[in-house]
Design a protein with these regions (language model features):
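C-terminal and inter-domain tail/linker signature
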Residues: 1-127
Length: 127
């Protein structure tokens, strides 16, 4: 499995409350800057913040760059928590040391369109 595949799978499981792969992939001293709260957080706090995505469906991902030490990945999300469906794109930079994630930062941009429209994928494929 590539770093991108592992990262995507770990995040999808964690958003559903299963942190087994996160615990395997992330270094215990991993740091994550969370833009929602404006703080650098540790792995325990990051895991708690991941529950904010429980109503979000994540679509396909695209690797921007990947090597032994770094992964840059772009993903789409759809959140149905509100009356109006929110669409977003997320770009994550992930640093590795000794094959473990030691730093992770994600920037989110909300979209005014459904990124699945006109594409060869749909949200139902990722529910």
């Amino acid at each position: 499995m590539t770093k991108a595949e592992e990262f995507d799978k770990a995040r999808r499981l964690a958003y559903k409350g299963d942190f087994s792969l996160v615990e395997k992939l992330y270094h215990p001293d991993c740091k994550h800057f969370d833009h929602r709260v404006g703080l650098e957080v540790n792995l325990d706090m990051q895991s708690a913040l991941m529950t904010a995505y429980e109503n979000t469906t994540f679509g396909p991902y695209r690797v921007i760059y990947e090597n032994e030490d770094f992964l840059c990945i772009q993903r789409y999300g759809r959140n149905r928590l509100t009356r109006e469906i929110l669409y977003m794109t997320l770009i994550s930079g992930v640093n590795y040391r000794d094959e473990k994630i030691v730093r992770h930062e994600t920037a989110i941009e909300y979209l005014d369109y459904d990124p699945s429209e006109g594409q060869e994928w749909n949200w139902d494929d990722y529910e």
